[in-house]
Amino acid sequence: MRKIAIILLLLAGVCANAQTVVPAKPQKIYKKQDNKGILYFEESSFGALYKTNGWGFFYNKTKIIHATKKKFWEIEFNKTKHEKETKTESVFTQGGPITPKNYYYGKINSLYTISYRKGYTKVLTEKSLRSGVEISLNTSYGVSLGLVKPYELMLIYGDQTTDNITFKTEKYSSLNASTFLDQNSIYSYAGTWQGFFDMKPMPGATARIGLAFDWATFDDNITTMEIGLNVDGYLLNVPLMAVAKNHQVFPAMYVSMRFGNRK
């Protein structure tokens, strides 16, 4: 009887311990300490890019679908240059209302573009450790609005051998073409804001494909570099130069840096 009592006491103790064990909660699929799979649901970031024909700034919003796929949209502002743009030094050093500035000879317009793109990210190599790098393929397309701004120069009219001269800030036209393209009549670049209120819209489309390298995949912060090909096209030829062939389509290589956060 004594042995039976001892056995019953031991069994009672085991049962009591079993009742106090808290059942394990099911693990969430996405946890920061896992270092695998999707850790966040969306990204928000700002970036800058340099193209072989210009530069730009953009905002990116990304939704993470699963471990190897994301979708995003971007808004971008950029400037596109003609490949024949070459800065020229003014032949004048003083004598006018302003200090002479260098200018682009033959340039008649500047092109600024506001673009909206949507696209997808395909993760090619997942980052398994914090010290690793995630490589992804980004493809996107969208619509754009080009803003063609006149490129204005300060021109000299009159007899330069006398004091009977006049300085005029003008944009290119068929009436002043001979003076606008005469380096001896170009005193200076008029300035960035000249022609701002004479901008004309030019609708277009844009597409981009690139490889992205992200070395902060499992951190709250985003640090991503991307390299690839960008193509901008417009409804008509964009008149950027008076002395070179103008284009309707502008392909370019680019490199961009993007910084932001995940949540």
Task: Identify what each model region corresponds to.
Residues Q19-F77:
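Short glycine/proline- and aromatic-enriched beta-strand/turn motifs that initiate or cap beta-hairpins
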Residues F77-S115, G119-T121, T125-L129:
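Outer-membrane beta-barrel translocator/channel fold
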Residues K36-E42, I64-K71, I108, L124-I135, ...:
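Short loop/turn motifs that connect adjacent beta-strands in outer-membrane beta-barrel proteins
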